[in-house]
From Swiss-Prot:
Similarity remark: Belongs to the HAK/KUP transporter (TC 2.A.72) family.
UniProt organism field: Rhodopseudomonas palustris (strain BisB18)
Protein name (Swiss-Prot/TrEMBL): Probable potassium transport system protein Kup 1
Compartments, as annotated in UniProt: Cell inner membrane
Catalytic activity: K(+)(in) + H(+)(in) = K(+)(out) + H(+)(out)
Entry keyword annotation includes Cell membrane: yes
Pfam families recorded: K_trans, K_trans_C
Segments passing through the bilayer: 10-30, 50-70, 102-122, 138-158, 168-188, 211-231, 246-266, 284-304, 336-356, 368-388, 393-413, 415-435
Alphabetized InterPro entries for the sequence: K+_transporter (IPR003855), K_trans_C (IPR053952), K_trans_N (IPR053951), Kup (IPR023051)
Flavoprotein as UniProt keyword: no
CC per GO annotation: plasma membrane
Gene that this sequence comes from: kup1
Membrane topology: Multi-pass membrane protein
GO molecular function: potassium ion transmembrane transporter activity; symporter activity
């Protein structure tokens, strides 16, 4: 396959995965701005003002902020809030801002889940609502059809999306071409609408109608939802294909369609009830509903896949308990399925569809999570500018300060929508933040307790003496600590009075980078008397595999026969205590999460018939 063919394939794939969310925004962005909870009169001045705001919002928040600036801040090729967090915490380790920035990154991850629940619901609803343009008699069927489409989407997740995924790119390319064509047809009828590119119209609208424009920002932000996906999906496709796709197809198609809808409103203000489908010729509405539904399903799939990816990163970075991770492709490391995440999302999405009933009602809930995440991305990347790129502080203040002011304006414009539905992403954000921070703090308390009770290895080795029997074979003790003796070894010695001929104290660690190559996977140290310390490293985008890591120990002259190797694990039971460290209810939550975590044998891919689990009880 030639380099050009590969590049074209990557470009089309990027269009299918990266741009689904932002690509379906024309379905509802202008409609909600003019006819949402804070309606704006459809006058020529207002249309020009809103179009100008949409244009400059897309240019500033997506083109300048993400495409030009933030996409430079990759973590060894990976993007997204957690990848950026890992990069920034590495840069600021030892600084006072370390923990506040860590908390900000966790908040961004928590807000992401609120967003990932709303996107499938609002996208598919807005597409199916096109049937109402055909005839109002179809209105009662909008919610049931949406529910069926979304149920089908979530049910096929466990089978993987590799085969269907090959269609995503061509379908989205067709979608963007149709968006552009519809826009051009309407612009030709009123070409003067292109004058709204002039920022004077946006400024004039803000000055003349400060309150109205403030409310408008809360809906205009819908035009850039999904903009952060350009950065999040960078690891899958690379910076270059995403940028080329944006400038060559996606950006022109989006802007042409928004200006086309604006041109339609200038000639027919009544079209505001659904300007997207009203710009479509009558004979084409039903096929367009079909294409729009396909596009919104693709947008939803991208968000669902992103939720799996963020969950895996959170598990690897110690923010979530172990979960079952299923690889749905033998070729692509990134194609995974996490059952718990999938069904949690499904329940939340269905509750939103049934509870809110329409895309207009859901639009009020959309925006807070997106603008919050965008604001945190700006703050984190400011530290990358200063500490990694070595920009002068004036340049950092000018670029990051300007972007942060824009983010803040949109964030506060969305905060006022709390009572109308904005409470939902905030509720999910608080819930997710509580879970993430409780797990992280709980694991920290456990490590401290284990460290306190740990016995130094040299003490144990001296205590062994010549009388302790040595069993044949190898014993691998999995431990979170990189020093001292794991509780499982002490229990084995205490109760069985024996130690294996070869003892390996293995620790699986997660690096601040997305991937660790096999050449750097393992480090083995000979401690003497048959004892070895093994450090196994994985990136936060990788899934641990302990037996595969043991195979790499041949480089250190150590070979492992799985049939002669036993794996010893500590099965820890946590007892909430009155000791300072965590609130009692959080201790109970941590204990509950531990009980429901995926067993270490499954998560680390250890053969279950070679495992010995020894129970220990710890107070936290």
């Amino acid at each position: 396959m030639s380099q050009n063919t590969k590049g074209a394939g990557l470009l089309i794939s990027a269009i299918g995965v990266v741009y689904g969310d932002i690509g379906t925004s024309p379905l509802y962005a202008l409609k909600e701005t003019f006819a949402g909870h804070h309606p704006i009169a459809v006058t020529p001045d207002n249309v020009f003002g809103v179009l100008s705001l949409v244009f400059w919002t897309v240019m500033l928040l997506v083109t300048v902020k993400y495409v030009i600036v933030i996409m430079r801040a990759d973590n060894h090729g990976e993007g997204g809030s957690l990848a950026l967090l890992a990069l920034v915490t590495e840069l600021t380790r030892g600084y006072r801002v370390y923990y506040p920035l860590m908390l900000l990154g966790v908040i961004a991850a928590a807000l992401f889940y609120g967003d990932s629940m709303i996107t499938p619901a609002i996208s598919v609803l807005s597409a199916v609502e096109g049937l109402e343009v055909v005839t109002p008699r179809l209105t009662p069927y909008v919610v049931p059809i949406t529910a069926v489409v979304l149920t089908g989407l979530f049910m096929i997740q466990k089978r993987g999306t590799g085969l269907v995924g090959k269609l995503f790119g061509p379908v989205m390319c067709l979608w963007f071409l149709v968006l552009a064509l519809l826009g051009i047809v309407n612009i030709v009828a009123a070409p003067h609408v292109l004058g709204a590119i002039n920022p004077i119209y946006a400024a004039d609208f803000i000055v003349k109608h400060p309150m109205m424009s403030f409310f408008a920002l809360g809906s205009i932000v819908l035009a850039v939802t999904g903009g952060e996906a350009l950065y999040t999906d960078m690891g899958h496709f690379g910076r270059f294909p995403i940028r080329v796709a944006w400038f060559a197809l996606v950006l022109p198609a989006l802007l042409l369609n928004y200006f086309g809808q604006g041109a339609l409103l200038l000639s027919d203000p009544s079209a505001i009830q659904n300007p997207f489908f009203r710009q479509v010729p009558e004979w084409m509405v039903v096929p367009m509903v079909g294409l729009a539904t396909c596009a919104t399903v693709i947008a939803s799939q991208a968000v669902i896949s992103g939720a799996y990816s963020v969950a895996r990163q959170a598990i690897q970075l110690g923010l979530l308990p172990r979960m079952t991770i299923v690889h749905t492709s033998g070729e692509e490391e990134g194609q995974i399925y996490i059952p718990f995440t999938n069904w949690t999302l499904y329940i939340a999405v269905m509750a939103l569809v049934i509870g809110f009933q329409s895309s207009s009602n859901l639009a009020a809930a959309y925006g807070i999570a997106v603008t919050g995440t965008m604001m945190i991305d700006t703050i984190l990347v400011a530290f990358v500018m200063a500490l990694m790129w070595r920009w002068h502080w004036i340049a950092v203040a000018a670029v990051a300060g300007t972007l942060l002011l824009v983010d803040l304006a949109f964030f506060f414009a969305n905060i006022i929508k709390v009572a109308q539905g904005g409470w939902f992403p905030l509720f999910i954000g608080v819930l997710s933040f509580t879970v993430l921070t409780t797990w992280r703090r709980g694991r920290e308390l456990v490590r401290n307790q284990v460290k306190k009770l740990a016995v130094p290895l040299d003490v144990v080795m001296r205590a062994l003496g010549p009388n302790v029997s040595r069993a044949r074979g190898t014993a691998v003790f999995l431990t979170a600590a990189t020093d001292g003796v794991p509780p499982a070894l002490l229990h084995n010695l205490k109760h069985n009075q024996t130690v294996h001929q070869r003892v390996v104290l293995a620790t699986v660690m997660t690096a601040d980078t997305p991937y660790v190559p096999d050449s750097e996977r393992v480090t083995m140290t000979d401690l003497g008397d048959g004892f070895h310390r093994l450090i196994i490293r994985y990136g936060f985008m990788q899934t641990p595999d302990v037996p595969a890591a043991l195979e790499l120990c041949k480089a250190f002259g150590q070979e492992f026969n799985m049939m002669a190797t036993s794996f010893f694990l500590s099965r820890e039971t946590y007892v909430p205590s009155l000791n300072p460290g965590m609130a009692h209810w959080r201790e109970r939550l941590f204990t509950f999460m531990t009980l429901n975590a995926t067993r270490a044998t499954i998560f680390f891919k250890i053969p279950t018939d070679r495992v010995v689990e020894l129970g220990t009880q710890l107070e936290i």
